[in-house]
Amino acid sequence: MYAVFISGGKQYRVVKNQIIRLEKLNSPLGTTIEFDKILMLFDKDSIKIGTPFVEGGTIKAHIQNHGRLKKIKIIKFNRRKHYKKQQGHRQYFTDVKIIDINSIKGEV
């Protein structure tokens, strides 16, 4: 069984007990959060596709870790003009473990 949901403007496909890396969430470590913007629920017997979201469907997850990724460098330059601009960026992330996937009737 798996589900597809939206978090931080991106779509993620998850199964139970999977650890995924999401965009930064403003919740403390060790808390349980619930995602309700579920696009699709899939079980070996049935598929539920939302319009746009599956009503009553939730995904419960446990926050494992907060952090930052490696620095990426952005370099912009013009040739023959002696112009160069450098910038770096480190993206924040949150690691989450999927605890449970529920539909409106209970488990899918």
From Swiss-Prot:
Transmembrane segments: none annotated. Signal peptide: none annotated. It comes from the Bacteria. The keyword Ribonucleoprotein applies. Pfam families: Ribosomal_L21p. One of its GO terms (molecular function) is structural constituent of ribosome. One of its GO terms (cellular component) is cytoplasm. One of its GO terms (biological process) is translation. InterPro entries: bL21-like (IPR028909), bL21-like_sf (IPR036164), Ribosomal_bL21 (IPR001787), Ribosomal_bL21_CS (IPR018258). Keywords: Ribonucleoprotein, Ribosomal protein, RNA-binding, rRNA-binding. Belongs to the bacterial ribosomal protein bL21 family. Part of the 50S ribosomal subunit. Contacts protein L20. This protein binds to 23S rRNA in the presence of protein L20. This is Large ribosomal subunit protein bL21. It comes from Buchnera aphidicola subsp. Acyrthosiphon pisum (strain APS). The lineage of its organism: Bacteria, Pseudomonadati, Pseudomonadota, Gammaproteobacteria, Enterobacterales. The gene is rplU.
